[in-house]
Amino acid sequence: MGSNYIVIEGLEGAGKTTARNVVVETLEQLGIHDMIFTREPGGTQLAEKLRSLVLDIKSVGDETITDKAEVLMFYAARVQLVETVIKPALAKGTWVIGDRHDLSTQAYQGGGRGIDQTMLATLRDAVLGDFRPDLTLYLDVTPEVGLKRARARGELDRIEQESLDFFNRTRARYLELAASDASIRTIDATQPLEAVMNDIRTTVTAWIKEQGA
């Protein structure tokens, strides 16, 4: 089995950091140790600057970032990361574990912002071609639970301060996309932590066996 790209997705407060740790632990138990970690937006000097622009509520002063400008900044950061970090790592046989990828844009901008989904899909295909994660773990949590957890961590970024309706639309789009794509596995992240961790271990182990590892 060659290297693979595993992405962890979900609303704020879904538990992506914990999930990443469980994925790493599971891979190591299966004898896979060569891996790197990415986050989106971010992961390169350019992408980190774009991350600051798009998430920091003070980054552009009083100027409002338009929805389309937001989308384009996410894609600029994403393609830079994919072309300069992710693809080279995979080519060398290194596994990549990502905190968010394109599914976030399809859910947050397509669902939350209500941007035309055909336009987003066209933009994705133009920028990324047929590049996709091999496995995506979507951690499903209600906005009420997720935002409560996120607020407990401290100050919220620009997107985390959106309305509950925004996150309900985002979650609905996540679920819709997960139901239509076999490479996306949904984990019930409202369960007790140990149950969530067990589900992640079981899902990743079963998926790797499916790949013939």
Curated annotation (Swiss-Prot):
GO molecular function: any one? dTMP kinase activity
Q: What is its EC number?
A: 2.7.4.9
Q: Does the keyword Translocase apply?
A: no
Gene3D superfamilies referenced in this protein's UniProt entry, alphabetically: P-loop containing nucleotide triphosphate hydrolases
Q: What are the GO cellular component annotations? A: cytosol
Write down what this protein is called.
Thymidylate kinase
Q: Which InterPro entries match?
A: P-loop_NTPase, Thymidylate_kin-like_dom, Thymidylate_kin_CS, Thymidylate_kinase
Catalyzed reactions per annotation: dTMP + ATP = dTDP + ADP
Please indicate if the UniProt record lists Kinase as a keyword: yes
Q: Would you say which domain of life the source belongs to?
A: Bacteria
Q: What does this protein's UniProt record list under function?
A: Phosphorylation of dTMP to form dTDP in both de novo and salvage pathways of dTTP synthesis.
Which BP terms in the Gene Ontology apply to this protein? Answer: dTDP biosynthetic process; dTTP biosynthetic process; dUDP biosynthetic process
Where is ATP bound in this sequence?
G10, L11, E12, G13, A14, G15, K16, T17
Question: Which interval of the chain is the signal sequence?
Answer: none
Q: Gene encoding this polypeptide?
A: tmk
Task: Please state which protein family the record places this protein in.
Answer: Belongs to the thymidylate kinase family.
Keyword annotations for this protein, in alphabetical order, are:
ATP-binding, Kinase, Nucleotide biosynthesis, Nucleotide-binding, Transferase
* Native organism: Citrobacter koseri (strain ATCC BAA-895 / CDC 4225-83 / SGSC4696)
Q: Which CDD domains match?
A: TMPK
